[in-house]
Amino acid sequence: MAHVTEYTCSGCGLELVNDGRAFVWNEETDMTEDFLILMSTCQKFYGAEIIGNVSETYCSECERYVKVYSITEVLGSIDDACDVVMRGIENHIREHGRKLSKLKDIRKRSQYSISEEDGHYVVRIPEFESFYYSNYLFPEMSKEEVIEDALNDFHEEIGGLIESYEKRHQRYLDSHYLVVDNTGRPKDEFDISEKVRCPECGSEINKHVDGQLPCPRCGGRIFGLGIFYD
């Protein structure tokens, strides 16, 4: 279960997230993938050659978000781990953009198949394998009504997914990236007031976001709302 805290500044409205994300890099994909630590995502650690965590902060000089990738483990003979992770971040952002474009194309085409199974209609979207629609509970629906209802459901489902992808992709594009090597640091060591340098302008900024710390943009007070994800 992941605990995500969404912070909002009471003064300037800046929004920041502390979600305890992890990241992995492996040679096969050459991508640095960040994710919430859940039961469903733990398998991502297997086969990873570089492991670490991600924190989000903000540079008031650049007026940009800064994502800090802290390397905690290097499993294998990789000398330039920081450069490798940075290259993997760039590859991951490009791949995320391609997936977003593909989802938009799938929505645009809206190709479907309809079949009769056990006396009711079933509609599937071949390019969107998770979608399944059946009129099992409403057998009186005509074939045309089933298709119309299924496509409405499909557009609602894929539309929500696209919106989520767009929001995340824009955050990727709006951020600077910093990779630091923490492999020599004890895993349980954590300093909420730790500072880092903005990779763009060199300004000293907080590495973490927390309700105990002032807003990194205006110095005002930030308030957090905690959410749990299974």
What annotation goes with each model-predicted range?
Residues C9-C12, C59-C62, S101, S115-E116, ...:
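Short cysteine-rich clusters marking metal-coordination/redox-active sites
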Residues T32, G52-R64, G211-R221:
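Cysteine-rich micro-motifs
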Residues Y165-K167, Y172-D230:
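Cys/His-clustered metal-coordination modules, chiefly Zn-binding fingers
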Residues S130-D149, N206:
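A short, exposed loop/beta-hairpin motif centered on an aromatic-Gly-Thr core
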Residues A2-T5, G52-S55, D191-E194, G211:
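Short metal-coordination and nucleic-acid-contact micro-motifs, chiefly zinc-binding Cys/His arrays
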Residues M1-E6, F228-D230:
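His-enriched metal-coordination microenvironments in redox/metal-binding proteins
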Residues G11-E56, V68-E90, N182-G184, R197-N206, ...:
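Short recognition patches in nucleic-acid-associated and regulatory proteins
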